[in-house]
Every structure is written in structure tokens, then in C-alpha cells.
């Protein structure tokens, strides 16, 4: 059963305790089963539905109701632009909105979610191979693509993470992340409903919200993106409030080493770092009982295999330095891109390995470090293959740098020249010399551009292609 903690036959008198806290609403496990089953009765039989995925109790019940009824859903960001929303609705072929609707509903009918309605009808568990949801990618390379995720893939990933993080029903999981991405929706919400722990959504991922969840509700497992953890680390009072926690988990973008170190110093916890994508879910992570090395995303999860290859497809040595293209495979892979068979075929090689599009290194112990995106983070300059992330890490260690992003700009002589975009007060010449001293001369930026802010998406990832085109 995908949502194992919501098995009606397993509910007991103790299930009157709160299972989910979100937007001021408190839902017990019994509330979740009764209200979500009522949603399932209204949505049952639909082909696909859209859910406006704001952090609300209605979203929780809509998602849960769809999974009970076996109806695939499309989580739609509440702040998405009209053109992108129209594409998602048209491409997915959804038949209705479930729950609240945006101002522009595109003429689709509306199925309400009633928080106080209850039904105790028993639904048969859908096939593990059935589609659970279609998550649209960020669209950095064109219109967003619909990633088709099966119930089997989600269950396999959550079980592997539970093993890696020693995640149990005794945990209290806290985050304030969006409910339209893998991080907040699949790991945070569905993970809690599968494992049976309490789930607290803070509305927004603020240091104060996380601290309050720790002190008032006994939060043990906190999820955040690097931007969140940077802000927590800048608020000493909030950071120290997380000392009783069990794990701080960072993902969706690389965690800067200075942020890792500051969190460890203030909270007493070295953050867990993990790696994944909408297409593969989470495939790599450091362990609750294992080594946590700043800048490294750990070992393959149970059932996952990885390899790093060069441009000719040959395996690169596991020496912790040689950069190559990261391929993964495992039971949590997506079923393909909706309506895009050519893109799906291109995503996998002839042997069934998923081409992540990221470049990485593996060391002798099997630990993985993500260098970045093959398209923007692997810089080929003067005959060298240079990872942008390595340079960014060094720049962030300079006291005059708050944020940094490194790209390779076209260059007639070098092929690509290294350009650093920096938020901070340090002079560019000083930063160039600093990198040359810390790494090597050929890895130094040829140019440093001081900017007020770096362009980022909703999950905090720097939009490097925008830097390349607009920079």
C-alpha cells in the first residue's frame, strides 16, 4: 500500500493525534482517511485532474484522495504564469480542477474538496505500475515536460530513503517547501503518509518557522534547500533551536560548504546531502549513520546503480577527481515524458541507464560529488575539463563573497573562458588571484562580474542559462 499509514484497517484509537499540521489546520490520521476518501469518491473515474498545489489542507486531501482512488494528478504551482499553466493543462489532458482553482481556470470544471466531509468506503489498492502523478519539469530547456511517476517508483524511493535516514514513524518531519516538486510533495508529504510520522508544514521555510516547529512540536527531521539553510545559519537563535533535531536534510541544489560548516557549528548536526531529479527521484544520499562530507552527496540508495563515463562512454576512474557524465538506474525511475516518446528514448542509453545530464566524480569509497549540469557546469577551457562547482566552492570561502555562480562563456582562443558572477564586496582581481592560489591557474576566472543578485528558480537553483544569455 503506497500510503501505508492510512490503511483504514490499521487505524487505532491513538490515531486521533495530529498527523498533519498545515496552514493552521490540524488533521489526525482518522481525519485524513475519512476526508481523503470523501475526495476519492468525488474524483473516482476521472482520467487525470489538476491540483493547485498551494500549501493548504485542501491540497493534502486532494493529493491523498487521488492516490486512494487511483486517479493520476498534476500538481500545478500556484504562482505559475498563465502560458506555462495553459501548457501543463493542455499537455496533460486533465479533465478538471480538484480543490481551489486559479483565477484563470481555462474553462475546466471544478471538483471541490470539503475539509469536513467524511467517507469510510474501502478502495482496492491500485496497481503498483499505475501512474501516481505527472510532475512538470522546470522548463529550463524549453516548455516543461511532464514526468510520469508510478506508484511503484515512489514507494521504492521512499523505502530506500527511510533505510538511509533511519526514518521512522517516531519522527516529526518539518518543512516549508512547495508541494509541487519532488522535495516537498513526494519526500515530505507522501513520505510522511507512507512511513506514518507526523508532518508539519511551516507555510514558508523561514528560520523562525523551523525553530518554532522544533521547540513547540518536537521536530526531528527538517527538509530545506540551500537558500533555506543559508538563512537558518544566518539566524543563530533559530539555528540553535534545531540542536534537538535528528537530521537536517538539504537538496534540490548544491549546499555551499560554508553553509554546511556553519550549520554544523550552530546546530551540532552535519547536514544530510542528497541528489536526485524529477525523473529519477532521489538516488544518492549520505547516511544517518555514515560519513557526511561537505559538497558530497553520498552513496547510491538501496537498489540504485550509478556510473560516470567520459565523452566516448568509457568508465572514468573512481579517484575523486576525474569528471564524467553521471548515469543512474534503479526501481525509482520515471516511466517517461508524457506525449514525448523521442525525448524519453533520448533520456536513456541502449542499456537502460538514465542520462542525468549532470557531471560528477566518484571516489574510491563510492562517494559521489556533483560537479553540475553537463550543459552549463562542465567548462572546457584551454584543453582542460573544469567543474564550475569546484570554483564556486572556493569563491564562497572568501569573506567578501555572499553568492557565486561560474559559467563558461564562448572564447575564440580557449573554447570557453571561465566567468564568475558574484554577489559581494570583494574586488574582481582579488577573487581571480584567490582562486588561482587555492586551486590552480587554469581554473581561475578570466573575468568576475559583480551583480546585485543571481537569478534563481522556485527551488533556489541558479538559472545559469540566463547568465549565459543575459550576463
Set out the residue ranges of the language-model regions.
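N-lobe entry segment of adenylate-forming
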Residues: 1-47, 69, 212, 428, ...
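Conserved pre-ATP/AMP-binding loop-to-beta segment of ANL
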Residues: 4, 11-16, 118-136, 143, ...
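Conserved AMP-binding/adenylate-forming
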Residues: 25, 40-80, 385
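Conserved AMP-binding A3 loop
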Residues: 25-30, 132-159
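Conserved AMP-binding/adenylation subdomain of ANL enzymes
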Residues: 155-172, 180-221, 235
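Gly/Ser/Thr-rich phosphate-binding loop
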Residues: 219-224, 234-293, 305
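Conserved beta-loop-beta connector loops within the AMP-binding
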Residues: 307-327, 346, 364-365, 426-428, ...
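AMP-binding/adenylate-forming catalytic core of the ANL superfamily
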Residues: 330, 335-336, 359-443, 453, ...
Amino acid at each position: 500500500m503506497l500510503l501505508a499509514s492510512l490503511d483504514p484497517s490499521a487505524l487505532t484509537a491513538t490515531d486521533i493525534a495530529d498527523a498533519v499540521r498545515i496552514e493552521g489546520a490540524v488533521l489526525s490520521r482518522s481525519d485524513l482517511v475519512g476526508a481523503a476518501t470523501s475526495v476519492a469518491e468525488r474524483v473516482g473515474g476521472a482520467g487525470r485532474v489538476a491540483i493547485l498545489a498551494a500549501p493548504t489542507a485542501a491540497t493534502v486531501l486532494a493529493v491523498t484522495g487521488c492516490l486512494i482512488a487511483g486517479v493520476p494528478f498534476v500538481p500545478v504551482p500556484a504562482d505559475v504564469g498563465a502560458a506555462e499553466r495553459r501548457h501543463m493543462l493542455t499537455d496533460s489532458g486533465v479533465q478538471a480542477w480538484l480543490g481551489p482553482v486559479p483565477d484563470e481556470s481555462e474553462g475546466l470544471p471544478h471538483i471541490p474538496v470539503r475539509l469536513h466531509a467524511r467517507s469510510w468506503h474501502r478502495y482496492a489498492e491500485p496497481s503498483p505500475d499505475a501512474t501516481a502523478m505527472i510532475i512538470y519539469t522546470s522548463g529550463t530547456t524549453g516548455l516543461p515536460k511532464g514526468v510520469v511517476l508510478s506508484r511503484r517508483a515512489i514507494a521504492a524511493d521512499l523505502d530506500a530513503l527511510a533505510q538511509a535516514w533511519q526514518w521512522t514513524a517516531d519522527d516529526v518531519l518539518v518543512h516549508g517547501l512547495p508541494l509541487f516538486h519532488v522535495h516537498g510533495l513526494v519526500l515530505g508529504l507522501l513520505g510522511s503518509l507512507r512511513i506514518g510520522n507526523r508532518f508539519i508544514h511551516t507555510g514558508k521555510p523561514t528560520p523562525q518557522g523551523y525553530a518554532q516547529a522544533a521547540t513547540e512540536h518536537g521536530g526531528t527531521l527538517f527538509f530545506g534547500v540551500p537558500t533555506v539553510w543559508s538563512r537558518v545559519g544566518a539566524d543563530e537563535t533559530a539555528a540553535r533551536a534545531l540542536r534537538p533535531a535528528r537530521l537536517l536534510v538539504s537538496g534540490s541544489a548544491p549546499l555551499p560548504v560554508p553553509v554546511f560548516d556553519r550549520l554544523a557549528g550552530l546546530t551540532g548536526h552535519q547536514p544530510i546531502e542528497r541528489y536526485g531529479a524529477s525523473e529519477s527521484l532521489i538516488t544518492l544520499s549520505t547516511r544517518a549513520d555514515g560519513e557526511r562530507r561537505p559538497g558530497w552527496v553520498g552513496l547510491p540508495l538501496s537498489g540504485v546503480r550509478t556510473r560516470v563515463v567520459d565523452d566516448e562512454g568509457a568508465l572514468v576512474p573512481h579517484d575523486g577527481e576525474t569528471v564524467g557524465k553521471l548515469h543512474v538506474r534503479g526501481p525509482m525511475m520515471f516511466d517517461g515524458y508524457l506525449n514525448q516518446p523521442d525525448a524519453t528514448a533520448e533520456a536513456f542509453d541502449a542499456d537502460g541507464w538514465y542520462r542525468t545530464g549532470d557531471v560528477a566524480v566518484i571516489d574510491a569509497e563510492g562517494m559521489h560529488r556533483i560537479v553540475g549540469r553537463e550543459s552549463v557546469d562542465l567548462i572546457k577551457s584551454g584543453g582542460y575539463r573544469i567543474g564550475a562547482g569546484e570554483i564556486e566552492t572556493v569563491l564562497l570561502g572568501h569573506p567578501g563573497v555572499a553568492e557565486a555562480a561560474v559559467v563558461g562563456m564562448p572564447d575564440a582562443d580557449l573554447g570557453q573562458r571561465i566567468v564568475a558572477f558574484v554577489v559581494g564586496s570583494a574586488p574582481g582581481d582579488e577573487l581571480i588571484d584567490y582562486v588561482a592560489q587555492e586551486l590552480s591557474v587554469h581554473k581561475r576566472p578570466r573575468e568576475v562580474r559583480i551583480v546585485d543578485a543571481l537569478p534563481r528558480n522556485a527551488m533556489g537553483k541558479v538559472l545559469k542559462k540566463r547568465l549565459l544569455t543575459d550576463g
